[in-house]
């Protein structure tokens, strides 16, 4: 791991220097909550996922999901599982990271990200990419996020009124209809008046008027768009001390893995870093085993999986591995991941999920990861 100024800089200071809106928000959130913990919520049902997000949300800054392994996932855009997670994220102050590991040609990954039944981009603040197919996958995901964001420059509010006018009103409107342009109100809204009537009979008599429907559309600026959809009427809960997360989306590049025998070479990792530098408006950082910031203006964040703590009665400062799971995963302590390797966020799954008290264990991991960060600043 190369020495870099970000290793000795507080999250609060880094939040002011970074140019990515979502990275800045995440760093401020980490400082506010004194947490650099991500929960890998690999559970089989939507009910369990939402329960964990609600109970452990106060201890974490990122919730990592795998929507395609969750049975009972509700795809409704307003009231489904993704929308409920977004509501819990606002309530407890964390970001949602869908661990999709996109790994296909650019056109395909853009569609997987922005469309389909899940519409990941609508509810996940962060996604990641396996860059084996090449840099085009990063460029296409960035393009998809940019196009999606462009659809939110303003809010459209539509009102419809229906009424039955008097005959005198209709006479006035008919006399003027050939001379006046379409009605436009003061704020630029289009007002379309559509009379519904039987027309004139052959002898020139007017038919009866049924009604007039007025449709008004107002286009109001949304300079600071947010995920405004709520689960229930009046649900305005928001984590105190910080505004709602920006609508900007972010990408993590899978640069290194914690699994034994993986094929991510140094050459591949370097290509990931280069791609990140080319798309700094979208790429937040990396899934990696160490800090990859080397150039002076690199300000990427790093998230590292495979974090596990020894039992409470053992040394928490161990610098080595603490075993594996027998299926290739290799574990390291928070002290090793954050304090020595220079990562920013520790990703923890089974270490918390399999504990007798997951909420209490999440606090233990949060405390250990934060301590490793603060000690790194002083080193």
Swiss-Prot record:
GO terms for molecular function: orotidine-5'-phosphate decarboxylase activity. Residues 169-178 have a biased composition (Acidic residues). It catalyses: orotidine 5'-phosphate + H(+) = UMP + CO2. Substrate binds at residues 42, 64-66, 99-108, 331, 350. The active site is at 101 (proton donor). Transmembrane segments: none annotated. It is an enzyme of class 4 (lyase). Gene3D superfamilies: Aldolase class I. Its EC number is 4.1.1.23. It comes from the Eukaryota. InterPro entries: Aldolase_TIM, OMPdecase, OMPdecase_AS, OMPdeCOase_dom, RibuloseP-bd_barrel. PROSITE patterns: OMPDECASE (PS00156). The gene is pyr4. GO terms for cellular component: cytosol. Residues 165-198 are annotated as: Disordered. Pathway: Pyrimidine metabolism; UMP biosynthesis via de novo pathway; UMP from orotate: step 2/2. Belongs to the OMP decarboxylase family. Keywords: Decarboxylase, Lyase, Pyrimidine biosynthesis. GO terms for biological process: 'de novo' pyrimidine nucleobase biosynthetic process; 'de novo' UMP biosynthetic process. This is Orotidine 5'-phosphate decarboxylase. Pfam families: OMPdecase (PF00215).
């Amino acid at each position: 791991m190369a020495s870099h100024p970000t290793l000795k800089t507080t999250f609060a200071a880094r939040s002011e220097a970074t140019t990515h809106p979502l990275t800045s928000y995440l760093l401020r959130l980490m400082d506010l909550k004194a947490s650099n913990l991500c929960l890998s919520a690999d559970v089989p049902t939507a009910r369990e996922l939402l329960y964990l997000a609600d109970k452990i949300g106060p201890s974490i800054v990122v919730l990592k999901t795998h929507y395609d392994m969750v049975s009972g996932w509700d795809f409704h855009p307003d009231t489904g599982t993704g929308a409920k997670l977004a509501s819990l994220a606002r309530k407890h102050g964390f970001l949602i990271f869908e661990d999709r590991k996109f790994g296909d040609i650019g056109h395909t990954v853009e569609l997987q990200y922005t469309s389909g039944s899940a519409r990941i981009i609508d509810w996940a603040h962060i996604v990641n990419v396996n860059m084996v197919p090449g840099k085009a996958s990063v460029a296409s995901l960035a393009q998809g996020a940019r196009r999606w964001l462009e659809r939110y420059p303003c809010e459209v509010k539509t009102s419809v009124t229906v009424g039955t006018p008097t005959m005198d009103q209709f006479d006035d409107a008919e006399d003027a209809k050939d001379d006046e342009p379409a009605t436009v109100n003061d704020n630029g809204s289009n007002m379309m008046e559509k009379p519904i009537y039987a027309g004139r009979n052959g002898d020139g008599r007017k038919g009866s008027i049924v009604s007039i429907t007025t449709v008004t559309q107002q286009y109001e600026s949304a300079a600071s768009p947010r995920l405004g959809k709520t689960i229930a009427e009046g649900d305005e809960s928001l984590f105190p001390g910080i505004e709602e997360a920006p609508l900007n989306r972010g990408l993590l590049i899978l640069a290194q893995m914690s699994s034994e025998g993986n094929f991510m070479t140094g050459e591949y990792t370097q290509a990931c870093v280069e791609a990140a530098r080319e798309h700094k408006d979208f790429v937040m950082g990396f899934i990696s085993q160490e800090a990859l910031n080397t150039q002076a203006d690199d300000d990427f964040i790093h998230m590292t999986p495979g974090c596990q703590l020894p039992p409470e009665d053992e040394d928490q400062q161990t610098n080595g591995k603490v075993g594996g799971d027998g299926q290739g995963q290799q574990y390291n302590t928070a002290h090793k991941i954050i304090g020595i390797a220079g990562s920013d966020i520790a990703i923890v799954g089974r270490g918390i999920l399999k504990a007798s008290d997951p909420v209490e264990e999440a606090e233990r991991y949060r405390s250990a990861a934060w301590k490793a960060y603060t000690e790194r600043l002083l080193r």
